[in-house]
Design a protein with these regions (language model features):
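Conserved ABC transporter NBD signature motif
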Residues: 58-68
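Conserved ABC ATPase "signature" region
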Residues: 2, 115-132
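Conserved ABC ATPase signature
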Residues: 136-144
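ABC ATPase NBD coupling module
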Residues: 67-83
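Helix-to-loop junction immediately C-terminal to a conserved catalytic motif
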Residues: 50
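Hydrophobic anchor residue at the start of the ABC signature
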Residues: 149-151
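Q-loop/switch helix immediately C-terminal to the Walker
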Residues: 89, 96-108
Length: 212
């Protein structure tokens, strides 16, 4: 099918002084979709895109695996064997949102945990010079979500990729530098949907720009 997803997401942004807004997200089959934003409700972007608010809830597959068919045991096992084995100096903890939700389909599709960890280590090492850009005062989760974003960017197999992290409070120069870093490892023919109150870098060829 031409349309891979057409999801609506109601962003609860009252905590940062903004009103709720409805975002419509559309992508085509074969696209990699990166989303940069910070959902304030319990649901994640992944859940929105892959089921909870879709009319075909529970039918979307990543790597041939339906994430909603995962059992609690499978999820717990993956967190322990894969995420829990990631060195703590990378700031990665099992509670980080969406790590298991995006990577678990890879695990179930036959991608071993060591391979995932190796890719995470490699990418994190490459982007470490930008590490301080994510350490923003007043955003206690920024650093963790930045590492989560690195994981999002390196997992190339799923058709939908979620790029999730705070960029609202960095300067335009730093934001451009961050974009350039992720652009170098972004899969070809991918789509980036930027969910943020901050302006997008001018050099980005946006297929679609959604602003919260």
């Amino acid at each position: 099918m031409d349309e891979l997803m057409n999801a609506n997401y109601i962003a609860d942004l009252k905590s940062i002084g903004r009103k709720d807004k409805l975002l419509s997200i559309t992508g085509k089959a074969g696209d990699n979709i990166f989303i940069n934003g910070s959902p304030k409700r319990c649901e994640t972007h992944f859940e929105v895109l892959c089921g909870l608010r879709r009319p075909d809830v529970g039918q979307v597959k990543l790597c041939g695996i339906n994430p909603y068919e995962m059992t609690a045991v499978e999820t717990a096992t993956f967190r322990r064997d894969t995420i829990g084995a990631v060195p703590q100096d990378l700031g990665l903890i099992p509670e980080l949102r969406m790590i298991d939700q995006i990577a678990l389909p890879m695990k179930l599709a036959g991608v071993d945990g060591e391979t995932i960890i190796a890719e995470i280590r490699k990418l994190t090492s490459e982007l470490m010079p930008l590490h301080n850009l994510f350490n923003i005062p007043g955003k206690c989760n920024t650093r963790k979500q930045a590492h989560a974003a690195m994981i999002r960017a390196v997992i190339r197999n799923p058709q939908i990729m979620v790029f999730h992290g705070f960029l609202d409070d960095v300067s335009d120069i730093d934001r451009d530098a961050i974009w350039q870093a992720f652009h170098t490892i972004r899969p070809q023919n991918s789509v980036l949907i930027y969910l943020s109150g901050a302006p997008a870098p001018e050099q980005v060829n946006w297929t679609q720009q959604l602003r919260v």
